[in-house]
């Protein structure tokens, strides 16, 4: 190599290095903006560290300090059930019953427009990034713009989820769910955190008991008998907000989801065969392979004079193909079972989830106002006294009453319920408000006698 050629190659190398730095520099100028765009997302590196801590534990049964991490705030009665209970206990006379029903109608009327406006704002924020939009396509967004819009939607969702009495699941809880698998869950999945930008879970309605059959995964069969359903910790509703690096924001709601099965709800996962099942399948392959080799291989070896090395090679290829087919069929069956389970668990997705959350928040708002109205009416001093003292009294009374009626420990937000009640007080008695348009009564529909069809006389 001459000096001239070496200098020429070196110059090309420096030029290529300069171009490469320029290209990567343009990318680096974009991606450092992601932390600012994402706001405070879940630190997936911290999540991975917590998962490592749970892997070192021996058979953990629940997340650490679970009673402090998760507080149930969902009122486990529908509005109609709550009205009947309040009427039976506090408003038994006809006049009191009519007054409570009128108050309930007034709350419904006032909250309807409030949550309709919230839903309209949410849908306007979500529409540019809605993957299920049925209208004409809008100009495509860049990845940083899409991430910024997604974080804006999530920030707007937080107060609505709080009013709907969803509790956010902590990073420690998610680490437990990603590591620990229930022994009766035959379908297990593997999640690669490197594929995700953020993962958020909210839940309500914690229960401990036997899960509904269609929401379960696995056949629950032992070696010789069918195992009885185990009691598990699960949630009546779970909301997921997740984003993969190559995808978009996924908003989904599920019902009857066990704590150890949260990872099954994520959009990017791989079905894997549990260790015990893999060991059993391998044992079956070895036993059947030895039997085939003894019965068939020895005959081929002696009668056809095939070399031992060639016979072993053919046998290894045969067993490898058989093992690959068996494990592939097993994974396909498990993937189908997981798909069937998610079909029954899924309740709403993306834009429909926003509407469902607005309705649920309105319902919880009404129930909190009804409880505050009924309990403060029987308090000796009413709303007299400091707001802090009143809210503490209201919280204690309502929590004890809900525990006695439902058997569930519910954390009641007395301060928020008082605020709901006080916001309604100035307009009480104005239902419907002055100037509200009234619909004309529906005219009764009378059935007209069928007209006789003209008949032609045939002579």
UniProtKB/Swiss-Prot annotation:
Pfam families: DUF3754
Compartmental location: Membrane
Residue numbers bearing the Phosphoserine modification: 332
Chief localisation class: membrane
This protein's GO CC annotations: membrane; mitochondrion
UniProt KW keywords: Membrane, Phosphoprotein, Transmembrane, Transmembrane helix
Source taxon at top rank: Eukaryota
Transmembrane segment boundaries: 280-300, 301-321
Membrane protein topology class: Multi-pass membrane protein
Region span, Disordered: 435-459
InterPro entries documented for this protein: DUF3754
UniProt xrefs under PANTHER family: TRANSMEMBRANE PROTEIN 143, TRANSMEMBRANE PROTEIN 143 FAMILY MEMBER
Protein name listed in UniProt: Transmembrane protein 143
Gene name as annotated: TMEM143
């Amino acid at each position: 190599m001459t000096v001239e050629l070496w200098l020429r190659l070196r110059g090309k190398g420096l030029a290529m290095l300069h171009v490469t730095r320029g290209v990567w520099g343009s990318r680096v100028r974009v991606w450092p903006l992601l932390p600012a765009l994402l706001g405070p997302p879940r630190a997936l590196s911290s999540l991975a560290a917590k998962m490592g801590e749970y892997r070192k534990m021996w058979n953990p049964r629940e997340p650490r300090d679970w009673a402090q991490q998760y507080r149930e705030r969902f009122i486990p009665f529908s509005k109609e059930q709550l009205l009947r209970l309040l009427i039976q206990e506090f408003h038994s006379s006809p006049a009191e019953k009519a007054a409570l029903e009128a108050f309930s109608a007034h709350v419904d009327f006032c909250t309807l427009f409030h949550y309709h406006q919230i839903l309209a704002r949410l849908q306007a924020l979500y529409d540019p990034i809605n993957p299920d939009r049925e209208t004409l396509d809008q100009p495509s967004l860049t990845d940083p713009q899409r991430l910024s819009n997604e974080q804006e939607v999530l920030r707007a969702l937080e107060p609505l989820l709080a009013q709907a009495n969803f509790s956010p699941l902590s990073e420690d809880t998610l680490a437990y769910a990603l590591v620990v698998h229930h022994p009766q869950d035959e379908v297990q999945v593997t999640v690669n955190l490197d594929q995700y930008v953020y993962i958020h879970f909210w839940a309500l309605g914690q229960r401990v008991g036997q899960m509904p059959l269609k929401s379960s995964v696995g056949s629950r069969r032992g070696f010789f008998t069918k195992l009885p359903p185990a009691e598990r910790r699960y949630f009546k509703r779970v909301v997921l907000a997740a984003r993969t690096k190559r995808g978009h924001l996924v908003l989904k709601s599920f019902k009857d989801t066990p704590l150890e099965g949260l990872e099954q709800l994520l959009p990017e996962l791989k079905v894997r065969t549990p260790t015990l099942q893999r060991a059993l399948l391998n044992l079956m392959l070895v036993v059947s392979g030895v039997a085939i080799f003894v019965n068939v291989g020895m005959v081929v070896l002696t009668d056809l004079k095939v070399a031992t090395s060639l016979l072993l090679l053919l046998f290894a290829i045969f067993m490898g193909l058989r093992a690959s087919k068996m494990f592939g069929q097993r994974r396909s069956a498990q993937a189908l079972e997981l798909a069937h389970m998610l079909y029954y668990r899924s309740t709403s997705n993306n834009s429909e989830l926003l509407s469902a959350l607005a309705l649920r928040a309105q319902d919880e708002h009404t129930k909190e106002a009804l409880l505050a109205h009924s309990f403060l009416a029987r308090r000796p001093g009413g709303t007299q006294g400091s707001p802090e003292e009143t809210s503490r009294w209201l919280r204690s009374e309502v929590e004890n009453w809900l525990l006695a009626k439902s058997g569930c420990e519910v954390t009641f937000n007395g301060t928020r319920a008082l605020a709901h009640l006080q916001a309604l007080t100035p307009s009480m008695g104005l239902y419907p408000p002055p100037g509200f348009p009234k619909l004309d009564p529906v005219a009764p529909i009378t059935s007209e006698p069928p007209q006789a069809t003209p008949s032609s006389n045939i002579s």
